[in-house]
Every structure is written in structure tokens, then in C-alpha cells.
Swiss-Prot record:
Gene of this entry: copa
Main location: cytoplasm
Protein function: The coatomer is a cytosolic protein complex that binds to dilysine motifs and reversibly associates with Golgi non-clathrin-coated vesicles, which further mediate biosynthetic protein transport from the ER, via the Golgi up to the trans Golgi network. Coatomer complex is required for budding from Golgi membranes, and is essential for the retrograde Golgi-to-ER transport of dilysine-tagged proteins.
Species per Swiss-Prot/TrEMBL record: Dictyostelium discoideum
GO biological process terms held by the UniProt record: endoplasmic reticulum to Golgi vesicle-mediated transport; intra-Golgi vesicle-mediated transport; intracellular protein transport; retrograde vesicle-mediated transport, Golgi to endoplasmic reticulum
One Gene Ontology term, aspect cellular component: Golgi membrane
Protein's cellular compartments: Cytoplasm; Golgi apparatus membrane
UniProt-annotated stretches for the region Disordered: 820-885
Name the UniProt record assigns to this protein: Coatomer subunit alpha
Biased composition (Low complexity): 844-857
Subunit-level organization: Oligomeric complex that consists of at least the alpha, beta, beta', gamma, delta, epsilon and zeta subunits.
One family name in Pfam for this protein: COPI_C
Membrane topology recorded in Swiss-Prot or TrEMBL: Peripheral membrane protein
Alphabetical list of PANTHER family matching this protein: COATOMER (PTHR19876), COATOMER SUBUNIT ALPHA (PTHR19876:SF1)
PROSITE patterns: WD_REPEATS_1, WD_REPEATS_2, WD_REPEATS_REGION
Amino acid sequence: MLYKFETKASRVKGLSFHPTRPWILASLHSGSIHLYDYRIKTLLEKFDEHEGPVRGINFHMTQPLFVSGGDDYKIKVWNYKQRRCLFTLKGHKDYIRSVEFHREAPWIVSSSDDMVIRIWNWQSRTCIAELNGHNHYVMSALFHPKDDLVVSASLDQTIRIWDISGLKKKMTTVKPYRENDPMRLQDELFGTDISVRLSLEGHDRGVNWASFHPTQPYIVSASDDHQVKLWRMNDPIVDTFRGHYNNVSCALFHPRQDLIISNSEDKTIRVWDIIKKSTVHMIRRDHDRFWTLASHPNQNLFAAGHDSGMIVFKLERERPLFVQNGDSGVFFLKKKNFNSFDFQAGRTVSLFHISKLPSNNGTQTMSYNQTERAILVSSDAEGGSYHLYKIPPKDSNTVNTKKGTGVAAIFVGRDRFAVLDKGNNVVIRDLENEEIKRCQIPFTIDWIYPSGSPGTILIQSEDKIHMFDIQQKKMLCEIQVHGVRYVIWSKDRNYVAFLTRDFIVLANKKLEQICMIHETVLPKSGVWDDNGVFIYSTSNHLKYLLQNGDNGTIRTLESTIYITGVKNNKVFAIDREFKNRIIEIDTTEYVLKLSLLQQNYNQVMTILRENRLVGKAIIAYLQKKGYPDVVHFVKDDRTRFNLALDAGNIDIALSSAKILDDKDCWNRLGVEALKQGNYQVVEMAYSRTSEFDRLSFLYLLVGNLSTLKKMISYESSDIMSRFHFSLYLGDVEERIKILQEAGLHQLAYITASIHGLTEKAESIGNLITSDGKSQLPQLPKQSYLLVPPSPINCNPNELNWPLLTTTKSVSDVMGENRFGVEQSTSTPTGDWESDEDIFSEGKSQQQSSQQQQQQQQKGDWEEDILIGDGNNGGGDDGGWERDDLKGLEKIGTDGFNNKQNDHVALFVPPQPGPSFSMIWARNSQFAVDHIAAGSFESAMNILNSQIGAVNFDPIKSMFMNIFMATRSSLGCNASTPSLLMPIQRKSAAPYITYGLGHLIERLKTNAYKSTTEGKFNDALSHFTYILHTIIFCSVDNKQEVNELKDLINICREYILGIKIELQRKELSIGAQKDSTLGRQAELAAYFTHCNLDPSHLILSLRSAMNCAYKVKHFNLAASFARRLISLNPNPDLATQAKKVFNFAQQTPTPSDIQQLNYDERNPFVICAHSYVPIYKGSPLIKCPYCSSCYLPTHKGKVCSVCQISEIGKDVQGLQVITIQK
């Protein structure tokens, strides 16, 4: 059996798989409903509305609904998309045991302890039928998958089959009765809608579960008489399966095989063979009773709920056993037949038959020797074995078979194969199965794989893959990859892909890592295509991976497949039903990316011109890679506008903005045009958005005063804008006029007076004093003439800023040669311009340059060629003449100015490669390497997935130390900045300063010393520092990894114990110290159960003995004294302990003494948050990093010991860097 997912929660009473998505619902005894994604192992949602245990749960087959029933007598229908309960069905009068949706009708069937089965219409939200007949609790009621039947199981020791065809007919047929017709009432009271077809009796005690077979007329039942029974609806024969030794909780049929699965309160799951009536598999748990089972409606997945959560599992591996037959096809084993599938013919041929299948429970491998046409099959199940088959010729059915024992076997040469035996040796054998050579490897071998070089194999050991030379018996190279599951070589054997559970690593044949990507879904299979692209599959997608790390999705898969080959745009695969499939794929996306990587711009332009862009993702990719000219190939105007702005192409952005005519587009276009100094476009953008203030200022800057004057009359309603315009123009009379229109006559008078407009000032003054009350304002003593500055450049043809010349883009270079002369393969010399020559972007400059070049060419032609001369072809071949001109021998060339030579090509610097920080982050799966690279966010994500880290404040300083310690500053000249040089270890990874030796030294010299001296706060800081530093450590071998794990346990025990002791001391000096003596004694007692060094355990026992003595718990004091004496303390302390022990033996503990929450005879662990004991068998959760124990109520909080991780979070586990010295 294979575990796929496991949860830790309260007791699970009900389970249901979603029919299409990788989800499972679990109803808990605590009253909560949990929705999990078992593929990514994550809790998605919680639903908490029931009061009391929830025993029934079921997904709807097509709608986004599920139904639940609990001990609160309520049936609730939920919508998981809306994340809420839609409605509640009430009618049962006791606990509800099971609920289920009908596959077609809008019905729900429910069973209850009120001895009634009810059928509900969830659309009308009413009960449409009651099934009465059982005289005890009805434990389950289920619909038949196809027929109109219901099966129920009850504690009255019977199983009933109910016929509901009458109910279905009644609910789907319109009755010809009126609402108050007496015949209608008679039909409802005495109609035979539901009848009992069968009542099955045979169990000696109550029946807990009964369910139908998906296709056969069978029923399976589980009972408290420890038996599982198989009933036949058309046959009185009953089969009984015995083996459980406690109540059987649930039983169901395997949907595709002749198997029955049952679970029981005896803490086992058993798989029964219907034919042989015997147990074929069994899962046993030590402390958890099983309560429920569920099977996936479409996949070979099962789930079981137990006391502390649930498990999702498979009975056996579903991966078909296959091996590639070069490029032409694939060999695969189906049942007991070896078959061959030809890619070109698309036909399957049976090769030969074998007598026994290899076990499918372990890891199976198949290797093919194309020269000798031999197939090697190995399995590590049942101790490991291998079989060697030689494919017989067409005219023979005899198969030459050799077999032997070994964990794994692969071909390593034309007539040699390697076997990994149980003794950790690699044995080389010939095709006659005779041993040729035996290689002893100095370290533990986990598995062996084929290698790309002849005479070598790949050896997997711990977190590394080694290449081993069989002849020389030595390691050639290695690569660090954790948990490799599959190794796939390219066709030319130059590249290899390593598939792990979470990563895909590409390397060359020297095992030098090329790239590594993280994959959230388990990679299933993969092959290399002819272009060097790795095509791989997950359970839901077909994907690709380039050697630079770029990856993407090719298409979605309806079911899981295993890729066997790739040719052009066809992917060949085999599914779990052993069917060979040919899948057409669109290779445009990865061919485009590959062409860019190989700088094959012809192919890139072909794809772009044919409009084969997949979507916005490709456009964003090209833009990210530095190809902004992709804007020429985009048709969507908004996307085209955005790309043009990013590329700084104002002309294309302007044309798109005119089509879109959106205010936001014009605003953005105006900002970009202003940056480039494009006056015309800025003017148009401001006009379209009616930003007249900005437009007027623009006119002032460029000196366009005539248009600015027109704006004054245009903005006649806005006095303030007109006044600003008059200030820009320096028009005093217009200013006075505007002030008068605004009623500001005094300001108008002052303006006219100081500008010397005497007549205008007098008329305004008379207007002011005409009422006889107002006086003329006092004129300023000093005044300045407000004249706007004159623009520097008033030439309307030169308002736009000149732009720098740029290099020609890929599309320009390819486009120039589209209809012209074909490019020469030789290097251009002399005055011929190459593709890297710069060109002018200004339209006027480009036209003048072309005219000048045409005029120059025209003049040269007129001087050298006589049009109409019949000999202008020259030579016999019709080539150009090369006649020597006489009389020019003594003439020099000084003074001739070749302007073309002055046109120096702009140097185009090469694109910078990836920095060392990028390489560190890209090539590593360790958080410490990402920290050294400065990629703190990805490091936090890795730590969250590995140890559940959520609080990074305590380790912030370590992040900065690691980041700074991997860089050295190299001083240069005074005028140049310093150079940062990386400090690296092997394989282009940063050097990590934290090591095991440093931590052990600090443990001994600081942490233990402070604890002995009673400086608990100092000791706490030392142990916490060590616990935090372990996350970032690098070690040399697996032994040191184990030492790190021991160090984590030591730090956890000391931190917990010190915190308990500090709280006890805090209570002992508080205002209520006398009232907390009992709690102080409890804390002192808990401290003695921390796994401390004997010298420190002596001190904790002394403290606990004194506390117990003070609160008169003499029996506990005697117990602590006994433990203290057994540790051989110093004589004084031993004498004191003996006195306490003798006194406690003579003096009984008072009966009215306060009882302590402490039982030394019952094993327990201490809750690190509440400091109370968690006795053996009680539910608990742990910190995913330091493994501190907590009560379940503290789930989701930050661990009190390590102060980093989230309590109870499911994680992958800490990965530590191992450096082979």
C-alpha cells in the first residue's frame, strides 16, 4: 500500500472524494468539516456550523455542493465555491449517521438513530419519503450507483434493500389530480412508492455499514460481530470474511478489481480477495482505531478515517512498466504479456508471455539491450529480484529466462549488466547470469541508474548522485540532488534530467548542473526531444523545460499519462490502462523560446510573421528578454499600446491611442512623449484630455503665442485661466480687462497705473470714486515689469528633441533582407555597412540621408558608365569592368574627405550574463543559498515549506550575516567603486560559515556553563541561538546530519526546561507566591522530565524535591529523592536527599493537601505553551521544526520554543547542505 496523503486532526467520522478535483472532505468528531487538496497536501477550507460530531459527508457528482449530517439532528447543504451553508434540512429526531446525494435525481438519502431513513429533495428542500422498518439505529443508507435501490444497515442485525422505483416514477410523472382531490390524498397515504425488496439476516450483532458493488449485484456489510459478509442479491449464498478481532466499522468494494476493503476498531485496514476469500493486504496503526472508508469514483484512490486524522492511499502502483526501444517504439509489460508498440505504425504487437508478474508494491525498473534484444526487469519488493528475458525471433515462442536476487539491475554494456545486491555491492554479470566482477562501494547505495558513458553507472546515495567507473572502480563525478526518483538521458547521451518529488534538475554528461526548477505537482515521466528540450508530464499537465531554466505548460491532460517518446509535434505516451496514446501538441511556444536561446532569428521572425503567438504570456516573455519590437506583431490595440510605450515607440503608441481614444491612454502617452520631447504628440494628448493649463504652459515654453491668444477667447468662462494666459502672453490690456470683468477694479487701476496706461487708469479711477465712498488704492513704491521670458527655439520645425541613433532590432535586420539581395556569407569589408550600423530615427534626417546617398551614387554612375554603350557589361562573363585609367599613377589621394568613413558604427556591448547571486538562487533548493543570493522572499518560502517558518524576526540578523559573509570587497582605483567578489564553495554555490563544530563549541563553553551557574536567561539565549543557527548549517556527511538532529533535540529540551523554571521562579517571587505553591511544585516536577545532562538533571531534581517537601507532598518528595540518589550526586546533596526520603517514608501525605496535575507513573510529554502534561494516548500536535509538543488547541500558533515555526503545519522537513570534503 502506498500512502499519498496523511493528516493530523481530530477523529474523522466521514470522508468523501470530489469526482474531478484532487479534493477530499473530512467530517470530524469535533464538529468541523475540513476540505483538503491531497495532491499538494494542503488544507483548503474549514466549515464550522454544526454543533457536535459530523458523521455523514458527501460531494455532489456535478454541482459545486456537498451535504453533511451531524449529531445536532441537522442536514446542511453547502456550496464550496461560495464557502457557505445554503440551507438546513430538519426532520430527524436523533443523531444522523450518513448522508448521500443521488447520482441523477435531486435527492439526498439520510439515516439516523431515530430508526428512520429519509429521502429529501434538495431543490425543493422538503422530505419526499420516509423509510420505516428498522427497529434500532440505522447506521448507513446508500443509493445504488445505477438502479433505483437503497441499501441500509442497522444495529437490529439486518440489512434491507429498498425499491424506490415507485418514488422515482411518482416524482417524474404529473398526476391528473387537483390539489384537494380525495383520490390524491388516498394515493399519497396508501400508494406503494417504496417497498422492501430484500431483508438480509446473518450477522450476530449490529451492522455498521452496507454498500453496493458498482457493477455487480453484490452487497458488502461490516458488523460488530467482527465479520465482513458478501451478499448476492440473486443468490442465497453468503461469503464471510473473518480476520478482524474487533468491531468492523466500514467495508466497500474495489471499483475495478475483485477486492473488498474493510477497516475496524482493531486499528487495521484489510484488503480481501473475493475469489480466494483471504487477506491480501493489511495496514496497521499502533494507536488509532479506524472508523470510515471512502473510494474515489474515478481513480484508484482510497481514504480511511481514524482517531487522529485520515490517510489517502493506493493499494498498488499504477505506473506501467515500460522501456524505450530507441527512437522507434516502446516495450511494456501488460498483465503477463510483453508487448511492443511501434511509433510509426501505431500498432501493438505481443512479443512473449511470462509465468509470473513482478510485485507491484515496490519500485520496478526495466532496462533494454538493443544489441542483444534482451530485457531486464527488476523489483525491490520481497527482498528484491531480477529477471533477464531474451526476445525470441518471430518464428519461435521459446523465451530464454534468467533470474536472480538483487534490489536493482540495469544494462551497462553490450553483454553486461549491473546488479545492486543486499550487501551494498554492485555485481557485474554477463548475459548468462554469471558473475564477472564485484565492486564494493564505501558508502550506502540507495539505487543505481544507467549512465551516459559506457562502462559507468550512476549511484544514488543520500542526497547525491555519483558517476562510478566500473573498470577503474572509482567515482568520476557527482551532483547533489535530493530524492531522485527517475533519471532520463537525452538521445545523444550528452544531457540528463533528474526527477525528484519537488524538483527537476538538468545536467550534462559530467553531472554539471545546468538548471533546476521547482515543480509543485509530482513529475511523472519525461523524454528529451530532438532539439534538446525536456518534455515531461505531471498528473494534470504536459510541460517543457529548456536548458536555460525557462519552462511552461504545453497542454492540460484529462488523465495521467507516462511519456514514451516525442517526434515533431506528436507525443507518444502510455496511460494506466496500458493504452498507447498519440497526443498532438503545439510546439510554437517552446520552439520560439529555443530559437531565441540559440539566436536563430530567422525561425523567430517566421513564427512572429505567421501570427502563431500563443497569447500574452509569449509577448511578455519577449519583452522581458529584451525584444520590444514584438509590438509590430501584436494586433490587439491595448496590448500594442502598452508594448509601444514600454519600448518608447511614440508613433505606434499614437496610432493605437487614436483607435482606443481612452483618457488614461492619452495621459500615459502625454507623459512618455514629454520625456522624449515630442512636442506635437504632447500637444495632441493635452488637447484630447482637455488639460488646458498644461497645454498653455507648453505653448509658453515653445513660444507658440498665437495659439495661446486663441485660448483666451476659447476659455471665456474661466476667469482664472484667462488671467494666467494673459500673464503668459504679457498682455497688460487683456489683464486689465479680465480684472474689470471680475469686479476687481482696484487691482485693475493699480495694473494700469504702474504700466503707464494713464487714460485707462483715469477711467477706472473715476469708476471707483463714483459712489463717493471708495478711495483710490495706494500705488506700490517699487514695481517690476512682468514680461514672460522668450523661448530659445521658436522654429516650429525643430520643436521636437533630436533622438539618439539606436541599433537595428531583429525585426528590422530581418525585414531589410526580405525583398532585397540575399545576404552574403562573407564578412563585409571596405565601406559596406554591416547590420550593426546605426541609423537615424528622425524622418527628415532619414530622408536627407537617403537623398544624399542617391545623389552620390548617381554621380559615380555618370562618371564611370556610358549608358547605352554595348560594352558596359565588360568581360566574357558579363561582370563589371575593371579597366585601369591611365595618367593617375602620380596623383595622390590627400585631401579627399570620405564622409562615410567618418560615420563610425555605434559599439553594441554584449548582454551581461547572470550574476553570481542569480546563479546561486537558480541552482539551489537550500534556503541558505537563496539568503546568500539576496533572494530573501524565496528563502522564506522554502523555509515555510520545509519547517513551517512563519516568524522571521528572530533570524533576521542571521539573514543579514549570511548575505554579507558571502561577499568580499576588492578595492580598486580611487575614482572607481569597489568590486564585490563572491566567496563560493564547490559547484558555484556560496560558502556557508555556519558549521557543526562552532555550534558544539558554543553548546559546551557557553550554554552548558550558563545553565550550571544558574544564569538561565543567558543560557536561554545561547540555546535559542544554536537552535536558530542549525537551519543554516552545512555539514560534511550523514553522521553530522544526525548530530544536528541530536542538537535540535538538546536545544528543545533545555529551552523548554529553562522556560518552565523561569516561570516557576516568577511565581515564587510574586505577590501571590503562597497561593501558587502547588503550581510551583508542578512546574518543578515537569522540569525533571526534560531530557537534560545528568549534572543538570541533579539540580532540577533537587529543586523539585524541595518544592514537593514545602507543599507537603511527601510521596513526591521521596520519589524525587530516590531519583536524585540514583544519579550519584555529591555527598552533601546525597545526604540531604536521604534525609528527605527517610522523613517522607515516615510521614504520610496529608489527605487535604492540594492535588497536583502530575502522575509520574503515566508517561507524558509537556505542552510547550501551557506547561501542562499531555499523557500517552491523548491527542497532541508538534512543531514541524523543533518537534515541541502542544495541545491541539494551540494549532496555528507560533512555536514557543523555536519562535519560528507554525504549530501543527505539514512540512517537507529541513534540508541541510552536505559538503563532501
